[in-house]
Amino acid sequence: MVARYVPEAGDIVWLDFDPQAGREQSQRRPALVLTDQTYNRASGLIVVCPLTSKRTPYPFALSVVVDRVEGAVLVDHLKSLDWRAGNAAFHCKSESELLNKARTYVGVLLGIG
């Protein structure tokens, strides 16, 4: 039996963000996983920040390069999603510095940092 992939913190995964509303990110896109694999496996959920290929100066957008494409991690678009229903697929592992910075920004955003 082949083990099923369970996302872990620091993974960049492809994930379906639809349905969406208003200014939320939509469609299938990459996202940075913030939650640990133990939580993800037990809950069936992951907390992620979507990535965009647009690079606009914004306080909660962290610059990132994935597959030679410059973009940004949208920290203030933090979202909890069912990773199975969203068809999460591993793309690559981010650098630990990016994960740590994203988590720090989330803390600032929520006033817990």
Please report, for each region that a protein language model flagged, where it lies by residue:
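Conserved functional hotspots at enzyme active or ligand-binding sites that engage polyanionic ligands
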Residues: 1-113
